[in-house]
């Protein structure tokens, strides 16, 4: 995501004036060294910006206020090098509106056994300074992330990097505009939702845009731009004979390229990060956008079919969260089952719109018949997802809260080819089993649409939900239905009392 290059995480080190000027200079020097080395060698996705050491209530509060108003700052990382009395932090933490990470580390990795003295003990007080700060976070009921470990350890780098991605995703969601081309699929329940509450909770700006407005832009795309995009297709994919130059369905591919360019222009110029379509509202379009949606997802846009704006928003968020990580993320639907005894599997797919970021091999580009939508044969990319770990995530509106349901998956290779299936797909074993997973998913009310990701894990999504203040339900190898039912009941009580 290009916009992440402009973002910052501010680093505030806590101390106090109880210490000598010499000690405070050492604190500042250590913080500067850490910042430089983390920026240069830790592979972090966002630049760390060191702020002056916080030694008074006013200094600390000023940084928090500035962080709130900064469009570049997506989060605040704090470290208690020495002891920093937490009452000095109350105003700052009370007003902070950005994600908070406490880095519980110390400058030295090892104790200098033969040299250690009280000067060393006086300077390196993370062990108890961090606990003082932790109390105030708990007292204020703050959602926060704690990373424990030496600042030169790769595990700590990974955790900080993932938190940065989450902070960037939250920053993005606060500004996220979602274009709904057409309304929701008629009579479908789960794709509905409270758009006002979504804007209050997440920042999502969800608005309807007539398909006719999009058609005007699509129809005005220059022929030269379409030809250039067709050349890109030919370089990127294996084209079937039907859509190659001179093929009987080449016109369908030409129209798909026109759609992609027009849709991207509409979304980019309007500042949209996500969009939805619906096959029930295609007036003026020659085909249901398939290839266009696939490629726009790969370029970072969130997408939801049939007007599913919550999944479109979540897809965009997880795309941002997965920046720089291996694996892709796509719109997905649990489509059909393989119920062989001892080998239960789910075939995930959709009519057309599966993101090629999850493709195991070079996709095949084809155009085939699609009865739904009653338009011309649409172009689409065909591929299968690679074997490995994955997660399905579904965001639903429970009326008094949003609930994020996630399921751990094991993607498997196709046991046989599916030459007659004209859509992209992923085949997986849901954990702990199909029986328990499906029952739990249904009991939790999770949608038939989901975000399928092989780049973002459950813990990242848990942190996102914690910061956002939404309910989080996990289905994994440890899930048992009686315990899940109890969790859902207790969650109901908690959200009625506390929210």
Curated annotation (Swiss-Prot):
Sample GO molecular function, one term: L-arabinose isomerase activity
Keyword Manganese: yes
Cofactor binding note: Binds 1 Mn(2+) ion per subunit.
Isomerase recorded as keyword: yes
Keywords: Arabinose catabolism, Carbohydrate metabolism, Isomerase, Manganese, Metal-binding
Pathway terms, separated by semicolons: Carbohydrate degradation; L-arabinose degradation via L-ribulose; D-xylulose 5-phosphate from L-arabinose (bacterial route): step 1/3
Binding-site residues for Mn(2+), renumbered to this chain: 306, 333, 350, 449
UniProt catalytic activity: beta-L-arabinopyranose = L-ribulose
One Pfam family cited in the UniProt record for this chain: Arabinose_Iso_C
NCBIfam families named in the record: PRK02929.1 (NF002795)
Job of this protein: Catalyzes the conversion of L-arabinose to L-ribulose.
Family to which the UniProt record says this protein belongs: Belongs to the arabinose isomerase family.
Stored HAMAP family: Arabinose_Isome (MF_00519)
Protein name (record): L-arabinose isomerase
Organism whose genome encodes this protein: Aeromonas salmonicida (strain A449)
């Amino acid at each position: 995501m290009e916009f992440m290059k402009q973002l910052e995480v501010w680093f505030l080190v806590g101390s106090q004036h109880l210490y000598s000027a010499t000690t405070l200079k050492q604190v500042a020097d250590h913080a500067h060294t850490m910042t430089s080395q983390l920026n240069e060698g830790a592979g972090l996705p966002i630049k760390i910006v060191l702020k002056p050491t916080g030694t008074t209530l006013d200094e600390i509060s000023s940084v928090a206020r500035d962080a709130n108003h900064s469009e570049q700052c997506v989060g605040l990382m704090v470290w208690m090098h020495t002891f920093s009395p937490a009452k000095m932090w109350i105003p700052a933490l009370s007003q902070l509106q950005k994600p908070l990470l406490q880095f519980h580390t110390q400058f030295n990795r090892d104790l200098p056994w033969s040299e250690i003295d009280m000067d060393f003990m006086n300077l390196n007080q993370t062990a108890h300074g961090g606990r003082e700060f932790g109390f105030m976070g708990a007292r204020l009921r703050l959602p926060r992330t704690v990373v424990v470990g030496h600042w030169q350890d790769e595990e700590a780098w990974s955790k900080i990097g993932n938190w940065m991605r989450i902070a960037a995703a939250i920053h993005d969601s606060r500004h996220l505009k979602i274009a709904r081309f057409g309304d929701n699929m008629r009579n479908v329940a789960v794709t509905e939702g409270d758009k006002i509450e979504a804007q209050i909770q997440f920042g999502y700006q969800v608005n309807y845009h007539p398909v006719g407005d999009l058609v005007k832009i699509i129809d005005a795309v220059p022929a030269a731009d379409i030809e250039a995009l067709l050349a890109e297709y030919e370089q990127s994919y294996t084209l079937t004979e039907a859509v190659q130059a001179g093929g009987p369905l080449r016109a369908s591919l030409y129209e798909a390229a026109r759609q992609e360019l027009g849709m991207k222009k509409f979304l980019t110029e309007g500042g949209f990060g996500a969009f939805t379509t619906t096959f029930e509202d295609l007036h003026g379009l020659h085909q249901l956008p398939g290839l266009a949606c696939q490629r726009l997802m790969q370029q970072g846009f969130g997408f939801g079919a049939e007007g599913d704006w919550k999944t479109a928003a979540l897809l965009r968020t997880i795309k941002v969260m997965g920046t720089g990580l291996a694996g892709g993320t796509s719109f997905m639907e649990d489509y059909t089952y393989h119920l062989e005894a001892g080998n239960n599997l789910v075939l995930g797919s959709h009519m057309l719109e599966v993101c090629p970021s999850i493709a195991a091999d070079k996709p095949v580009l084809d155009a085939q018949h699609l009865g739904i939508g009653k338009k011309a044969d649409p172009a689409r990319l065909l591929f299968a997802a690679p074997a490995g770990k994955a997660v399905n995530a579904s965001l639903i509106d429970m009326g008094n809260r949003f609930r994020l349901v996630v399921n751990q998956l094991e993607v498997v290779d196709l046991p046989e080819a599916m030459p007659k299936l004209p859509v992209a797909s992923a085949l997986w074993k849901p954990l702990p089993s199909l029986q328990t997973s499906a029952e739990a998913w249904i009991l939790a009310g999770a949608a038939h649409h989901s975000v399928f990701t092989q780049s973002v894990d459950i813990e990242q999504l848990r942190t996102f939900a914690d910061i956002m203040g939404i309910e989080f339900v996990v289905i994994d190898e440890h899930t048992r239905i009686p315990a899940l039912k109890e969790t859902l009941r207790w969650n109901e009580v908690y959200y009625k009392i506390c929210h």
